[in-house]
A protein has these predicted regions:
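Conserved MFS/SLC helix-loop-helix module at the cytosolic interface between two early adjacent transmembrane helices
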Residues: 46-82
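C-terminal transmembrane helical hairpin of 12-TM major facilitator-type secondary transporters
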Residues: 262-305
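Helix-breaking motifs and short loop linkers at transmembrane-helix boundaries and internal kinks
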Residues: 27, 59, 80-86, 228, ...
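A late C-terminal transmembrane helix in Major Facilitator Superfamily
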Residues: 313-349, 356
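Helix-loop-helix hairpin linking two adjacent transmembrane segments in secondary transporters
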Residues: 84-86, 115-116, 123-172
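Paired small-residue
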Residues: 74, 85-94, 286-294
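Cytoplasmic helix-loop-helix junction between adjacent transmembrane helices
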Residues: 90-130
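Helix-to-loop junctions at the C-terminal end of transmembrane segments
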Residues: 47-59, 248-260, 344-345
């Protein structure tokens, strides 16, 4: 499962490191290529809200194997895309995999291991996420410069097939535990918003991911045009972001146990400051590396905090909570990358980064409100 997460995260965000060459070959703007992340987010939302209903009584092992197969198909479609529409079709398919897999991840972990080992299982799942964050962007950028962006995407296909073979051998049969529609009904899932802490928390979570991807989706064009570095150096900067993010994932657990809400307030506030600081420091390479390293440290570790929050906010309905979280996160990523694309094409990096800073600041405020409301209702 961790290998599958690695391939999934690498597939989802590979375009971030390859925007420039992809845009040139597909003969569209960098903003339009960035919409490949937006469309994957849209289809992830639709899938997360409906996967349990559509799967019905299907054995969950079969469903997971099918999703992993679809991930390999998506990678091949993108790598072989003759034009923009086929590229977007491949990105839509990876969105289906994202929504289906992540909405089932917590429930799957609960069925694979004893209750006492569920947190450890989820941590192992996230290990694949952290590893992909470390290597996907810089490796994608490097491979893109050596074998082209198509070759970089095609390299994900054997990884997905390896994950499929591993799951085929290791996953036990997992019968559907609920009647059709019990867990996947859209209206059932959205009743969670009747809880004020959940509603405010989801708003804070959504604005965090929106602000993050307004900026991060277009970091390569910023590095090339403002900082003035080439593809090889871009790969090194992305590696710094990834390594810092991996370190952040390892470190954040020390803060969540005693200061969950404080952590969720501070992280977006610091990232807003970083987004604003990148503008005056953009031409200074050393400063950009330090700032983006801090961005990676904070941004990659934050999802661990938000998944810990949803487990605390909805402890008795992991599947509904997981589906709702995926829907909110992926909608926010789609909106953020779309907004970032529009801003980058019309206002350049300055407008893009300032909006990202503002949205992240809003996330910090909403997280603070969530903490206050939660303390009053418990």
């Amino acid at each position: 499962m961790s290998l599958c997460v690695f391939a999934l995260i690498a597939s989802e965000f590979m375009p971030v490191s390859l925007l420039t060459p992809m845009a040139a070959e597909l003969q569209v703007s960098e903003g339009m290529v960035g919409q490949g992340i937006a469309i994957s987010g849209l289809f992830a939302v639709l899938t997360s809200l409906s996967v349990s209903t559509l799967a019905g009584s299907m054995n969950r092992r079969t469903l997971l194997l099918g999703l992993t197969t679809l991930m390999a198909v998506s990678g091949a479609l993108v790598a072989l895309a003759p034009g923009y529409m086929v590229f977007m079709t491949g990105r839509a398919l990876i969105g289906v995999v994202i929504g289906g897999f992540w909405s089932m991840s917590a429930a799957t972990a609960m069925r694979l291991v004893p209750a006492s080992q569920v947190p450890r299982a989820l941590a192992i799942f996230n290990g694949g996420n952290a590893l992909a964050t470390v290597v996907a962007a810089p490796l994608g950028s490097y491979l893109g410069s050596v074998i082209g962006w198509r070759g970089a995407f095609f390299c994900l296909v054997p990884v997905a097939l390896l994950a499929l073979a591993w799951q085929w051998v290791s996953l036990p049969a997992m019968k559907a535990e609920r009647p059709t529609g019990a867990a996947g009904n859209v209206f059932t899932i959205f009743t969670a918003f009747k809880s004020a802490p959940v509603a405010w928390g989801m708003a804070a979570c959504g604005s965090f991911f929106m602000g993050q991807f307004v900026l991060f989706t277009y970091i390569r064009p910023f590095l090339e045009t403002v900082t003035g570095i080439g593809a090889a150096t871009v790969s090194l900067v992305l590696l710094v972001i990834g390594v810092a993010g991996f370190a952040g994932t390892l470190l954040i657990g020390r803060f969540l146990g005693t200061g969950l809400y404080r952590t969720l307030v501070v992280i977006p506030a610091l990232m807003a400051a970083i987004a604003a600081a990148l503008l005056p420091a953009g031409a200074w390479f050393a400063a950009v590396v330090v700032l983006l390293g801090m961005w990676g440290l904070l941004g990659t570790s934050a999802p661990v905090g938000w998944w810990s929050w949803i487990a605390k906010a909805m402890p008795h309905d992991a599947e509904a909570g997981g589906g709702l979280m995926v829907a909110v996160v992926q909608t926010s990523i789609a909106v953020g990358s779309t907004l970032g694309g529009v801003l980058f094409d019309s206002a350049g990096s300055r407008g893009t980064f300032m909006v990202a800073a503002a949205v992240l600041a809003v996330s910090s405020v909403l997280a603070f409100v969530t903490a206050r409301i939660t303390s009053r209702t418990t």
